[in-house]
Design a protein with these regions (language model features):
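Polar low-complexity intrinsically disordered regions
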Residues: 18, 46, 92-100
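Short, basic, glycine/proline-bearing loop/turn elements
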Residues: 20-30
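Residues at secondary-structure transition points
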Residues: 31-39, 56, 81, 85
Length: 100
């Protein structure tokens, strides 16, 4: 899958997801940090299968679009914690989910 990580998620997620065989980018690595939500969505929506974010407003806004989103926007609800623990919790959830 083609995965994009929002700027509010740790960069430490990139390598573990790539290790699983996914193509992974982050908003930071694409130098799109700070872009308003609407523009960010238009820039990346068609290039990715999944977009992970902790931004509730962004996820809610996409869910109200009249047209179906070409990218699955996944609101990440893992509580804030040190990066290593966050990455471990995220990856445990990711590998136990059927993304088909």
């Amino acid at each position: 899958m083609r995965v994009l990580l929002d700027e509010n998620l740790p960069e430490g997620l990139v390598e573990p997801l790539r290790f699983l065989g996914h193509t992974v980018d982050s908003v930071a690595s694409l130098r799109l940090k700070g872009l308003d939500n609407g523009r960010l969505y238009r820039e990346v929506a068609s290039a990715y299968d999944l977009f992970f974010t902790k931004d509730r407003e962004f996820a809610n806004r996409v869910s109200t679009l009249a047209e179906p989103a070409p990218v699955g926007v996944i609101l990440t609800l893992i509580r804030q914690q040190p990066e290593a623990q966050f990455v471990a919790a995220f990856m445990a959830s990711f590998v136990s989910t059927d993304w088909s």
